[in-house]
């Protein structure tokens, strides 16, 4: 049976069960109105469907933690409709439906270590590292003077994702990208690339 905790102990990225479905807490807010009882507003993402919902709890409620297993695995390959990962401890192959991780797949490349979420013996999602280093394979060339005004341009990365980068970024550059927001963080020297 899953563990229950007081709603006031809720945290971001915590896994909870709501109406028999697994959710990941995206955000929460403790609200104390002038009149009436305090409550907690929780924004959560359904780990099966990817849909986000808002749930309101009384401050006296308790929530059920979802019974997730988290496994470190290395991305091996993708076929027509599944991504395949090799677990680090047991060296078992785990397959996940491409639809279940379509957002994360934008920044996924072979050999990358991720966390695979398993719920009731079924892999249902992954968590990427917070930032990844990827090569720019296609972008318009920068011109002198473009950097003075700031601004950005689209760039296609080696994984196929398209992000906005500063004008001084060129094809072949290695950039660090925040996987949660898809935002450019910095350009790396080739010597810095791991």
Swiss-Prot record:
Transmembrane segments: none annotated. SMART domains: EFP, Elong-fact-P_C. Disulfide bonds: none annotated. Keywords: Cytoplasm, Elongation factor, Protein biosynthesis. Involved in peptide bond synthesis. Stimulates efficient translation and peptide-bond synthesis on native or reconstituted 70S ribosomes in vitro. Probably functions indirectly by altering the affinity of the ribosome for aminoacyl-tRNA, thus increasing their reactivity as acceptors for peptidyl transferase. Belongs to the elongation factor P family. This is Elongation factor P. It comes from Hydrogenobaculum sp. (strain Y04AAS1).
